[in-house]
């Protein structure tokens, strides 16, 4: 029953932002109603409040309609991205679901397209998961024989989960997941909580860098250290994909990267969580 109620609320798109939209007008209505009733009586309060209530209800319906319309458009976009992924790769087994706490389909589709177009030999990913699996498939089916992905994850649990997922899909030779706990790391004159990259000992340069970690709550500008710390390992044609680029902290990180490493230009994709793609300028 509880699940059913939650589903009905979700279908009406009642969210935190909607509660904010409803709360302030409701308080104003109460204040106006009590004020008019106090000075002019009940009938006057009804005459004043009815048009206001009607207006607010119409505005609320329009607000919910626009919000639902936006969500439906986003669902269509994600569905199209999933269809594209299944067009580009042929999984041996069904792919896990892609949602809020995993890579969204539009991120996965972007990664697959970059793998197909640029055929990277080495992909390094910060934060493992379904994107690791899909990238491994893309490298196996569209890349060079020795193309592979190395994924760093600060969580031992998710490191194992991703490795198990790769084993089920028979992709162990195309992907490696390294447990890399976060530790104090000096970048410039600031200390960040960032991956221990001592195990990233590959001699190959990085052709595609996917930044989907560490979590934003670990520290301010949590993902900024990626470029300063890995810049020397990037190939001359390296492409960088930053997920969650709609966040102010990620936008600030990109601005600092472009200022400190002027050899890159940014392409911003305004999707569910925002994507920034940095390419070297020639």
Can you describe what each PLM-predicted range is?
Residues 163-204:
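S-adenosyl-L-methionine
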Residues 142-144, 202-203, 230-236:
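Short, conserved loop/helix-junction motifs that constitute active-site signature segments
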Residues 203-213:
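Short SAM/SAH-binding signature in class I
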């Amino acid at each position: 029953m509880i699940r059913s109620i939650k589903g009905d609320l979700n279908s009406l798109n009642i969210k935190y932002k909607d509660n904010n939209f409803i709360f302030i007008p409701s308080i104003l209505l109460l204040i106006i109603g009590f004020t008019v009733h106090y000075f002019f009586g009940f009938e006057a309060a009804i005459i004043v409040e009815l048009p206001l209530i009607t207006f607010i209800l119409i505005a609320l319906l329009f607000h919910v309609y626009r919000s639902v319309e936006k969500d439906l458009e986003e669902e269509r976009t994600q569905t199209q991205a999933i269809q594209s992924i299944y067009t580009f790769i042929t999984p041996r087994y069904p792919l896990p679901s892609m949602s809020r706490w995993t890579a969204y389909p539009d991120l996965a589709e972007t990664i697959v397209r970059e793998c197909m177009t640029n055929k990277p030999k080495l992909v390094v990913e910060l934060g493992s998961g379904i994107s690791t699996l899909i990238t491994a498939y893309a490298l196996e089916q569209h890349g060079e024989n020795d193309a592979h992905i190395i994924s760093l994850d600060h969580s031992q649990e998710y490191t194992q989960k991703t490795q198990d997922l790769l084993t089920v899909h028979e992709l162990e030779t195309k992907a490696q997941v390294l447990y890399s706990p976060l530790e104090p790391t000096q970048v410039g004159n600031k200390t960040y909580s960032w991956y221990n990259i001592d195990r990233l000992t590959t001699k190959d340069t990085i052709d595609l860098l996917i930044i989907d970690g560490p979590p934003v709550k670990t520290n301010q500008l949590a993902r900024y250290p990626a470029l300063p710390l890995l810049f020397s390992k990037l190939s001359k044609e390296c492409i960088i994909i930053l997920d969650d680029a709609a966040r102010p902290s990620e936008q600030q990180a990109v601005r600092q990267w472009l200022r400190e490493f002027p050899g890159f230009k940014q392409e911003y994709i305004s999707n569910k969580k925002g994507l920034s793609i940095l390419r070297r300028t020639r």
